[in-house]
Each structure stands twice: as structure tokens, then as C-alpha cells.
Amino acid sequence: MNKYEIIANEMRNRIKNNVYPIDQPIPDEVSLAKEFNSSRMTMKRALDNLVAEGLLFRKRGHGTFIIQSAIQDDHVHVVSNEILGLTNLLKDKKIKSKVIQFEVQFPTEEVAAHLSIDQKTPVYYVVRLRIVEGEPYVLEKTYMPTHLIPGINDDVLHDSIYNHITNVLQLKIAGTHRKIRACKSDHIDQQHLGCKQDDPILEVEHVGFLDTGIPFEYSFSRHRHDKFVVTSVNIRR
């Protein structure tokens, strides 16, 4: 984990544990950089992450403030540029993964097109139920090219795929393209997510790509409506 990520995690915990008063600016970058024994640039990058997450906002000439509505609740909050994966997004929660299906297959025309591969290139097909603090949160269906993301196995699937990609394979995840839509729950959602027949589902269609610009993941995540929030923060300068 990079220094700025360690600092961002600590600052995130401080914000959510009310270490800093919400009606006053947090300590300035110079003071925080000195406290964390880091450069000001590293400190700025850490705070930039928290601004992007919707926890902080900067007011020119006045400092950096906590956004009061960003206090922790029981939902998964995803901001527009979030590419961490659920395990990293909810570090302070107990997360389990139940692997429902895992196999290598040849992609359909649609899957191949989203991954920029041909239909003769094998992909992992993974269906996982993500359980947070004992409650089912999201049902994930994921496709990844086997040649691009080698080494996926049961151990990885029960831990974090993104940690495997970044820490083991040393690949850099550069970005993501998402489409978010409301859907009716189907019998599979009802079976695994514990939702009712009339409950809506928030589906996220996702294409992730590496810093080379190559897509490495095409997935669909089916979220319980009561456990998922998309956060967009716009600050008037």
C-alpha cells in the first residue's frame, strides 16, 4: 500500500470517528504532512482521495472541511471514480465471499467486445455473493481474460481479486466505465440476496481497464436496494 493510501485510510477513520470538529477546517496540509512524516504532495494526494469520496471539500481561502452528510452509515457508498473494489472500500467491515460458480469458458460476442478480445480467447467466469457483516450485499458476475489476469483461484476469490491484480500481479488499474440501472429482482436475486419479489435491484455494469488502456474486467453487480448508494459530490468554487 502506498504512503498516501495509508494516510488517506487514517484520515478517513478520523473523520468517521469525529476526531475533527465538523464546523471547523481540518488541520492544513503542511501540519498534517509534518504529523505523518510525509511530503506535502503526498498529503495533498491523500486528501484529494477523500475529496473525491465526498468526505471533504475545499473552500478557497478558508481550508478543507468535512462534509457533514458523509458520516458513515450502513450503505455501500460508491463515488464516480471509485475503483478500489468492495474489500478495499469497506476495510472496517467483515466481508466474506461465497463462490457460486467459477469456470473458464469462451466468451460470447458481447463479452468479447467489451473486453476487446476475440471469442477464441478464454475468460474466467465468476459468480460471487459478497456478504458484509453477515448480510448479503451484492451478487457479482465477472468475466476476465485468463492470459491478462492469471492465477485466479479459490483463495483469490474468497479474498480480493483487486488485491491479487495490484499486489500479486503488480498491474495498475487505471479506470472504469460504469452504467447503473434499476432492475426488478429475479429468482436468483431473491435466492442469494434475500430480497422480495417486488424489491428493486441496483445493477452496475462495469468495464475496468489497466493503465495500458486494455480492458481486464467486464462485470455485472446486482446490489440490494437498501445497501447501496451512488454518491456524487459537486462543489461550487
Swiss-Prot record:
Residues 29-48 bind DNA. Induction: Up-regulated by konjac glucomannan and by cellobiose and mannobiose, the possible degradation products of glucomannan. Repressed by glucose via the carbon catabolite repression system. PROSITE patterns: HTH_GNTR. It is found in: Cytoplasm. GO terms for biological process: negative regulation of DNA-templated transcription. Keywords: Cytoplasm, DNA-binding, Repressor, Transcription, Transcription regulation. SUPFAM superfamilies: Chorismate lyase-like, Winged helix' DNA-binding domain. Gene3D superfamilies: Chorismate lyase-like, Winged helix-like DNA-binding domain superfamily/Winged helix DNA-binding domain. The keyword Transcription applies. One of its GO terms (cellular component) is cytoplasm. The keyword DNA-binding applies. GO terms for molecular function: DNA binding; DNA-binding transcription factor activity. Its main location: cytoplasm. InterPro entries: Bact_HTH_transcr_reg, Chorismate_lyase_/UTRA_dom_sf, Tscrpt_reg_HTH_GntR, UTRA, WH-like_DNA-bd_sf, WH_DNA-bd_sf. It holds the Pfam family GntR. Residues 1-69 form the HTH gntR-type domain. Transcriptional repressor of the gmuBACDREFG operon which is involved in the uptake and degradation of glucomannan. This is HTH-type transcriptional regulator GmuR.
